[in-house]
Structure formats: C-alpha cells, structure tokens
A protein has these predicted regions:
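Specific transmembrane alpha-helix
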Residues: 2-7, 49-64, 132-155, 204-225
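Long hydrophobic alpha-helical segments that form multi-pass transmembrane helix bundles
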Residues: 77-149
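Alpha-helical transmembrane segments of multi-pass integral membrane proteins
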Residues: 189-301
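Juxtamembrane/transmembrane-helix boundary motifs at the membrane-water interface
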Residues: 18-19, 35, 88-102, 114, ...
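Solvent-exposed interhelical
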Residues: 59-77, 146-169
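Kinked, hydrophobic transmembrane alpha-helices enriched for aromatic residues
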Residues: 1-5, 32-44, 173-181, 242-269
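Hydrophobic alpha-helical membrane segments of integral membrane proteins
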Residues: 42-59, 70-76
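Membrane helical hairpin/interfacial module
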Residues: 1-50
C-alpha cells in the first residue's frame, strides 16, 4: 500500500497537482481506507489491517515534500525500534515457562450481536494503540513509498543488491520464527518457544513484507522485461493479475467467506480440522476469490470494493 501511495503521488505530480492538493487527494483516499477498515473490523474480522494502513497513509500524505533520504531515515529508525521490540518480546516469551499462545477464545462467540460488541471494543482498543501500532506499519509503507518514487521495481537490475538484502532478511525471519513456533507446537521443544516466536513475530513480521515484494520482483524480472517490450501477459499469470487488480475485494471477500464458514452462529465449520485441513480450507477460500476475480476480469469489471 505504501508502494501504491508512491505511484499515486507520482501520478498527481505528472498531472501538475500542487503539493497541497496532492496532500488532500492522498489523505482523503487513505482516510476512506481507514474508514473501510474500521467497518470491516467491527462487522466481519477483528484482525483487519486496512485501518492502520489508512492511518499510516494519511501520515505519509503530509510527508510528500520530504526527500527520499529523509523518508528512508525515518523508516529505518522505526524498523530499528521494531527490531528492538521484537528482541525484547522474544526474550520475555522465552523466559516465561508457562507462556502459551492464547488462541482458545478465537471463533467461540455464540451470537452475532456479541461478536459485534467484542469487535467494537477491539476497534476502540486499536484506536488507542494506534501510535504504537504505527511503529510497525509506517516504516513498511514508507519503504514502499520511496521504492515507488525511485522506480525500484521498474528497474530491478539497478536495485538488485537492495532487493536481495531484503529477501535474505525475510528468509531468516521466516525460517527462525517458523521453525521455533512449529517445533514448539509439535512438542519437540518447550511450549514457551512458541510464545516467544509469537511475541517476536508481532514486531519482526513486518520486515518480511518488503522481502516478499523484493523476491517477487526478482523472480518476475524476465517476464516484466518481456512485457515492457510489448509481449502479452503469460496465461499462467493472468489469474493472479486479475486478483491483484482487485486485492481489496479479495481481502474483504475472504473475510465474508470465513465469516459464513467458521463462526458458531453460522456454519461452525473447520474447528476440528488439523493444520493441514485448515490450510486446505484457507486455500479453498482464496481460490474462490481468485475465480471471482477472473470472472470480473473477463467482463472487464472492477471489484466491488475497488
């Protein structure tokens, strides 16, 4: 979303928008995203991310005049604070022999009115915690914003070292946290390591976002070069491009599908499935959104939330 904000800023600049007008346009769009996130959080899914992305986007809207070096300095300072928080959280979890990842209460609310009340309380707590949570979301969006302004993904060869460093960082975080969490959950190592990994992931997980984007840019560079030369989009990538154009509809659509499937007051399905079964269920839900996006693409229609 930070990358998208950067592209929007470039588009406004090319069209001759004054800086103040660009501030208003970008802030307005991200304010609407935050509003959609708040509604999504209360009505469907307490784990919404659009609200915080929207708030972070509003902050970025008023940093348009800042140089890329200044924005990156702010991002790296915030990343450093996130890393410090992750280390402290990891140590805290590892030192607690009784620590567990509390998931038992998720998905057990018996009625929709009670769910609405619970998620309204969640929204209130999230609003109060916004300054702290922005510590994790803002640096990722700032990095994406600068990448868009610098054309990082449009000129992968020139920025390959930067992209490779982000990929390496994402791989290390994913492997270390994932290994500790899974081994602890399987009973191979003490349960406290799952709690430690969960704590660390709350802070360090944001580092994997730029790494995933960087990895995709590196892998798809040859295809991007052919597209730039006028070649058609490969058929195998067409469905993913269709969903990418409708990413918000896909995101909210997954919440709607899971809402219908898993709550005790809906179909109450999936609670007894093992890890593989739940992964298969998640894949099936994603596949439905992919097919829906393909249908919309075939008829040249935007997603309902775009």
């Amino acid at each position: 979303l930070g990358f998208g904000g950067g592209l929007l800023a470039l588009s406004l600049w090319r069209r001759g928008f004054p800086v103040r007008a660009a501030h208003r346009v970008i802030a307005k769009r991200y304010a609407f995203l935050a509003l959609m996130g708040a509604v999504h959080m209360v009505l469907l899914f307490w784990g919404d991310i659009m609200f915080f992305y929207g708030v972070a986007g509003i902050v970025i809207a008023f940093l348009l005049r800042k140089r890329d070096s200044t924005l990156l300095l702010i991002a790296y300072i915030l990343f450093a604070l996130c890393a410090l928080g992750g280390v402290v959280a990891f140590i805290s979890g590892a030192l607690d022999p009784l620590g567990v990842v509390a998931t038992e209460g998720i998905g057990t609310i018996e009625s929709y009115p009670n769910l609405l009340l619970s998620q309204l309380v969640t929204l209130g707590s999230q609003v109060l915690a916004t300054p702290i949570i922005l510590l994790m979301y803002l640096p990722v969006m700032l990095a994406g914003f600068v990448w868009a302004r610098q054309g990082v993904l449009a000129d992968v060869p020139s920025h390959r070292p930067t992209l490779l460093r982000w990929v390496a960082l994402a791989v290390v975080i994913t492997v270390v946290i994932g290994a500790l969490w899974s081994l602890s959950t399987l009973g191979v190592i003490a349960q406290r390591w799952a709690n430690a990994a969960n704590n660390a992931n709350s802070f360090l997980g944001v580092f994997t976002g730029p790494g995933i984007l960087a990895g995709l840019a590196l892998v798809l560079q040859p295809i991007q070069e052919r597209l730039s030369a006028g070649a058609p989009l490969p058929a195998v990538l067409w469905p993913f491009a269709a969903l990418g154009k409708r990413s918000m509809s896909g995101y909210v659509g997954q919440s709607i599908l899971f809402f219908c499937l898993v709550h005790p007051f809906t179909l109450n399905f999936g609670h007894d499935l093992g890890a593989f079964g739940q992964a298969a269920l998640a894949f099936a839900v994603w596949l439905v959104t992919l097919i829906f996006a393909c249908v919309l693409e075939a008829f040249d229609r935007r997603g309902p939330f775009e």
